[in-house]
């Protein structure tokens, strides 16, 4: 993995591997981004994907929360987006201010799909900027905290590629899996193949831990999740370590899966090959701990909306959460149940992190 500085804080790596820790490690999904004033200063008037593709700027944005919350955050996550995989597969993606992602030419029929299936993806070439940003960030961090790489889950990426953006009804994605199940599997397989290579090359570039965001997992029924999501998540968990060995990386790289809303699948996710399963806030942690039976590390799961509450409420909710996950000295990573919001107060986030340290160290 190159001549990178040795980690000074490996708390999250140890927790992910199931080792005992002094306190639960803390990081937050979307910890780098729009709620930080320094993000807006650096991004300036650049387009979102233009920002991601500038390695120097992406690296700076990645490090901003680590710098602001020095000693409180136990990992950095590279500033990027799950939709870079569809881009690498030849699809055009725009990020519309205030509206979110938009695909001008979504996949709506078998002919559209064939174009994507026939497209030869060169991951190293298409996503070269991402690997440069990771390497640059890993060097700049100087071992202060480990660096996350990530990608979107295959089903979630298929949703965006077929819907043309976010959705409430999931009309087109559901149409695909119900009208063209075989073609849907072909698309999911191609996305999976690209995801495996992308994640593996992120590790080569310097990522020390990986997360797969299956953000739309909860939009599938349990039966459809078992057919259109879980097998591809399992493939990723199984194939990435093998690909890393082919690339000369023998050390264990912890992998996290976050299938938001997929409450019915927790037992299966705990034996899917991932080291960590991340939970959204709909879960009662005590129930999740029972179902898990100590097989994997659990991550989560504070409702991000708690950040709009008083300090007393934040303290109470953090205490409840850490205690419900067993105290945090083993098999637990503190996080939100989803990402930060643009409207959050950075000082409130700091208080949350301080309370996680204070309560988790007891």
From Swiss-Prot:
The keyword Ubl conjugation applies. GO terms for molecular function: uroporphyrinogen decarboxylase activity. Optimum pH is 5.7. There is a cross-link at residue 8 (Glycyl lysine isopeptide (Lys-Gly) (interchain with G-Cter in ubiquitin)). One of its GO terms (biological process) is heme biosynthetic process. The keyword Lipid biosynthesis does not apply. It is found in: Nucleus; Cytoplasm. Present with 9220 molecules/cell in log phase SD medium. Catalyzes the sequential decarboxylation of four acetate groups of uroporphyrinogen-III (octacarboxyporphyrin) to yield coproporphyrinogen-III (tetracarboxyporphyrin) with the formation of intermediate hepta-, hexa- and penta-carboxylate porphyrinogens in the heme biosynthesis pathway. Acts on a number of porphyrinogens, but only coproporphyrinogen III can ultimately be converted to heme. This is Uroporphyrinogen decarboxylase. It comes from Saccharomyces cerevisiae (strain ATCC 204508 / S288c). The gene is HEM12.
